[in-house]
A protein has these predicted regions:
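Accessory terminal alpha-helical modules
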Residues: 2-243
Length: 243
């Protein structure tokens, strides 16, 4: 359209401005208008009431749930204490659902499948579950960062989620984790000594499988890695293997 045509254009544009009175109302408006303006599924799901509850609860513990991208950054909250939705999903998937391989292999897809989403974000779970899962992963990351071996450093992401699951299962003395058990875990009990002992088992299984399967990334994403770790946890419970 030329400048002259634009000047003679008599069409009008109707703009409707809605001022929401609350976050809940704002999110209902966004969801209702999603057919006109496409919003990613993960972003839409993060507007559900359970995510608002998680956000409010975690903030009481100085953890800032970033269910709206960059929201916590814009509030000036510390980066290390800002928890993206995807990160929380990976933490719960790895620990509660005992699927650390999926946390490693497909982090961007955990909120796309209804079955996975419903298992991760369940309104019947105690909110402390989410806090504990975050703290366990943060503790695992800090532990792995302290390990000086360069081979370990290059494979942190291949063993991080698995070590978190293993350390939690061993501390709670079960390979069948339940939400309320995890919620009651005192994260301070996951000491450096505990991580040392658990890591020796995880790393042994990881190393053996790397020899069998060929590449570390393949091991980190494999079902077999999880299967062998859970079997080892059961052996520890039965007294067949000592920590």
């Amino acid at each position: 359209m030329s400048d002259d045509q634009r000047r003679r254009d008599a069409r009008d544009v109707l703009v409707r401005i809605i001022v929401p009175r609350s976050d809940e109302e704002r999110e209902r408006v966004i969801e209702a208008t999603n057919s006109q303006t496409v919003v990613p599924l993960a972003s839409l799901r993060a507007m559900a009431p359970i995510h608002r509850r998680i956000e409010t609860f975690l903030e009481l513990h100085e953890l800032y749930y970033d269910r709206k991208k960059n929201y916590q950054k814009n509030r000036g909250k510390p980066r290390d204490s800002t928890i993206p939705v995807g990160y929380l999903s990976q933490a719960v998937m790895a620990i509660l659902l005992r699927r650390p391989n999926d946390s490693r292999a497909r982090p961007s897809n955990l909120l796309k499948e209804d079955a996975d989403y419903d298992e991760i974000f369940n309104s019947e779970y105690p909110l402390d579950l989410y806090r504990v899962c975050i703290r366990v992963i943060k503790g695992t990351e800090a532990y792995l960062k302290s390990v000086s071996d360069p081979i370990v450093q290059s494979n942190k992401n291949n063993v991080k989620w698995h070590l978190a699951m293993f350390a939690t299962c061993v501390k709670l003395q079960t390979s069948r984790l339940r939400a309320h058990h995890i919620a009651e875990l005192a994260v301070s009990d996951l000491t450096i000594d505990h991580f040392d002992l658990c890591f020796s088992h995880v790393w042994q299984v990881f190393s053996d499988l790397t020899t069998e399967l060929g590449t570390p990334d393949r091991v980190g994403k494999s079902n077999e890695f999880v299967t062998r770790l859970l079997s080892r946890i059961r052996d520890i419970q039965a007294g067949g293997i000592t920590l």
